[in-house]
Regions:
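Active-site beta-strand/loop signature of hydrolases that rely on acidic residues for catalysis
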Residues: 55-62, 72-96, 162-166, 185-212, ...
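Residues that flank catalytic or metal-binding motifs in active/ligand-binding sites
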Residues: 41, 53, 117-119, 146-148, ...
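Surface-exposed cleft-lining segments at the edges of enzyme active sites
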Residues: 132-140, 166-176
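Active-site-proximal loop/helix segment associated with metal-binding centers of metalloenzymes
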Residues: 156, 161-170
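Alpha-helical scaffold elements lining the catalytic groove of polysaccharide deacetylases
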Residues: 176-187
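N-terminal, active-site-proximal structural segment of metallo-dependent hydrolase catalytic domains
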Residues: 2-100, 112-117, 183, 273
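Metal-dependent phosphoester-hydrolase catalytic domains
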Residues: 3, 26-45, 151, 187-196, ...
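Structured beta-strand-rich core segments of catalytic domains in phosphoester-bond hydrolases
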Residues: 29-43, 83, 87-160, 256-257
């Protein structure tokens, strides 16, 4: 299987890409999410490879792959995964190549400088049939926070898997910008009828942020994956990283303690119902 460098060249014809970037003029991702929702299920070409009912899934804020040992850690626990949700991924780091299997890459750009491009990166053993990028903005810093939305055909099923990789707005005193970023996903969740995974660094460092996320997920019938022992990275005593699922059940779930990032990775095995 060939590795697709989606940040370097256009995707093949089998991959329908809808690139959507909000602007700093106060627009939210709502309109972009509506456009993406309308494209769900529209690409009928068979993708390269199909995902199975049982999936090994990783979610990790890799802190720009800037710390010693990240590649060794990722190689050690990345074997056998079908989906990886990476936040603060750097295009200058060989993240996909570090995982010991060929993976397709779907990148949504976040903070970018002349020397480094970072964002959220979704890796998969199957080529996505749809890829949309949504962008929110940090209200104080004016920097982007990305969400990558991918859709995957499933082996032996008509329905498809919707995978949402989010790095949530962080530096905001109120909830307005955070709420807009989260609620924009409702358009997609209303339209999509198959299984769903939402994973990422949701920056739920306050009770009000966590309550907002919990209420939103409950509204669209998503449930949180529980971790015991819960070794997830915290701020102000609250876990920042989450995995929510719909139309799936959790078989195993663990948090791996690392020193190669300021976030501990989440590794789960999920079964599509």
């Amino acid at each position: 299987m060939q590795r697709l460098q989606v940040h370097c060249r256009p995707l093949l014809a089998i991959l329908l890409t809808v690139a959507m970037l909000a602007t700093t003029t106060g627009h939210t991702s709502q309109e972009e999410a509506q456009t993406c929702a309308q494209a769900l299920g529209q690409n009928r070409d068979i993708a390269d490879g199909l995902l199975d009912d049982e999936l090994q899934v990783l979610s990790w804020n890799i802190q720009k792959a800037s710390n010693e040992g990240w590649a060794e850690d990722l190689s050690n626990f990345g074997g056998g995964i079908q989906l990886a949700f990476i936040q603060e991924a750097s295009l200058q780091a060989p993240i996909a190549q570090t995982i010991p299997m060929p993976l397709y890459q779907a990148f949504a750009a976040g903070y970018t400088t002349d020397s480094q491009s970072t964002g959220v990166l979704t890796l998969s053993t199957s080529s996505p049939s749809l890829h949309c990028n949504l962008t929110a903005w940090e209200p104080w810093l004016g920097t982007p926070k990305a969400t990558s939305i991918t859709e995957y055909p499933l082996r032996g099923r008509e329905e498809r898997l919707l995978a949402i990789n989010m790095h949530a707005v962080n530096f905001a005193m109120g909830l307005e910008d955070f709420e807009q970023q989260v609620h924009a996903l409702g358009e997609l969740l209303n339209e999509h009828t198959g299984p769903v995974i939402i994973a990422g660094d949701l920056n739920t460092w306050s009770a009000s942020r966590q309550e907002l996320v919990d209420s939103f997920m409950h509204r669209y019938d998503l449930i949180a994956v529980d971790f015991t022992p819960d070794l997830r990275t915290t701020a102000f005593g609250r876990a920042l990283d989450h995995i929510y699922i719909r139309g799936m059940e959790t078989r195993t779930a663990q948090v791996i303690q690392v020193s190669s990032s300021d976030h501990n990775p989440l590794l789960v095995r999920l079964q599509i119902l």
